[in-house]
């Protein structure tokens, strides 16, 4: 135990009465403490208050991590989990996940407690936040002075404006942005692009990013940092055919090979737009399709495919020009 004088007391400790004693601990390079309450100051007998969190040495006292994510095929969730679990283990606090992938999950906005660290994760669609989720994200971003982290994933082409757009929404919502990451994951359109991402190097970079976040959680004077891209973009990336001319597959929808389909029903419940209809156990694709590939990836029979010529030509373009490994990028 060590007595803390008024001159050396960190600002985050000054809310305690002067005659407190603090026990300090160091784990994973994170300094934490427990206030030890004097039962009788004259005799200097004291006890630990087990209900006091161990991380008040942080400039942002937090007791829970909240992960909000959109992840139709699971790649974005995996990246968010890696970051959250590293921070949760270091700080010894629980993690709560809030998916807004399915329509039913977007019917109610999340509410955030005053002691949470927010991690918001989304894939990049056409260089931005997926447009069908943008209104929800904007409305849900009421994070009032909470520390937060922005994460986007991208399929090895480019994250364009997605990360800057997400970070701006978090700042506009009142969040204290500590860091931002754009992480390469497998491109959901292709069977060959970035199929092993995130790889070992990505994981090492994510770990280093987490350590930087832990350091920033200890400071209240974090400086702002820049993120490439437009914070309020109005345009989306224009997909290209293999010959580099514009491709138009906005209305393209998957098809099901009924001879392969075993009527398992997995695809009905996984569509983020809820537009796959059940017709005698077989999927019928009606309504909006955002090309997330969730239905195709979950199909164990490889019965679901896309046959639109522009869409297939775009995949060929990606595989021809964007197969060379790109780097994940981190900002803090």
Question: For each predicted feature, which ranges?
Answer:
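FMN-binding flavodoxin-like domain, especially the glycine-rich phosphate-binding loop
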Residues: 33, 51-66, 73-79, 83-103, ...
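Intrinsic disorder/low-complexity segments enriched in polar/small residues
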Residues: 8, 12-20, 27, 43-45, ...
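Acidic, Ser/Thr-rich low-complexity intrinsically disordered segments
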Residues: 235-273
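Iron-sulfur cluster-binding cysteine motifs and their immediate structural context
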Residues: 256, 262-290, 294-312
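Short, positively charged and aromatic/hydrophobic N-terminal segments
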Residues: 21, 27-33, 47, 56-57
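A generic structural signal for alpha-helix starts
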Residues: 71-74, 157, 262, 290
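Short, low-complexity, charge-dense intrinsically disordered segments
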Residues: 1, 7, 11-15, 35-42, ...
